[in-house]
């Protein structure tokens, strides 16, 4: 969602911006350390940058973009809520090797433990709704 909100040529830019505009200081869009790092990694990946017509961006540019998001009054950051680690282990446990589950399960556990709604473009987060995830699936908007 964060990357789509920043790159105007992202196919879901409009949806992501609308989601961000719905956030308020009382009910903010929340960054955690994992989403900070993921945003910075993706915002400085040459293949993605090329896809969005943003070649030549540096790590410093990605940090500036993150800073601009963090400066918005409706955006905040949060430390890991109590119980996140145990819940993450529980909902990530699979009887198969599923490397893509780790981050999704962590973000879901963070949102559940923190009592915040998770906005995403990724349908895979539906798997965590039975565990208590309050999901705003932007593609269904």
Task: Tell where the protein language model's regions lie, with residue ranges.
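Alpha-helix capping/helix-boundary segments
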Residues: 35, 83, 124-125
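Short, hydrophobic secondary-structure boundary micro-motifs
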Residues: 32, 51-52, 77-80, 137
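Short, well-structured N-terminal submotif of metal-dependent ribonuclease cores
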Residues: 1-31, 43-61
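Short loop/helix-cap segments at secondary-structure boundaries that form the rim of catalytic
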Residues: 125-132
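Active-site neighborhoods of divalent-metal-dependent phosphate/nucleic-acid chemistry enzymes
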Residues: 71-119
């Amino acid at each position: 969602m964060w990357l789509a909100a920043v790159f105007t040529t992202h196919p879901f830019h409009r949806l992501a911006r609308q989601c961000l505009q719905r956030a308020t200081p009382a009910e903010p869009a929340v960054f955690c350390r994992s989403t900070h790092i993921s945003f910075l990694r993706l915002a400085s990946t040459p293949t993605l940058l090329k896809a969005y017509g943003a070649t030549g961006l540096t790590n410093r540019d990605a940090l500036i973009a993150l800073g601009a998001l963090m400066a918005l009054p409706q955006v905040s950051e949060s430390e890991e809520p109590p119980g996140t680690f145990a819940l993450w282990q529980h909902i990530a446990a699979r009887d198969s090797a599923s490397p893509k589950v780790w981050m999704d399960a962590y973000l879901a556990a963070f949102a559940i433990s923190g009592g915040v709604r998770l906005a995403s473009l990724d349908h895979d987060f539906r798997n965590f709704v039975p565990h208590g995830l309050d999901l705003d699936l932007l593609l269904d908007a």
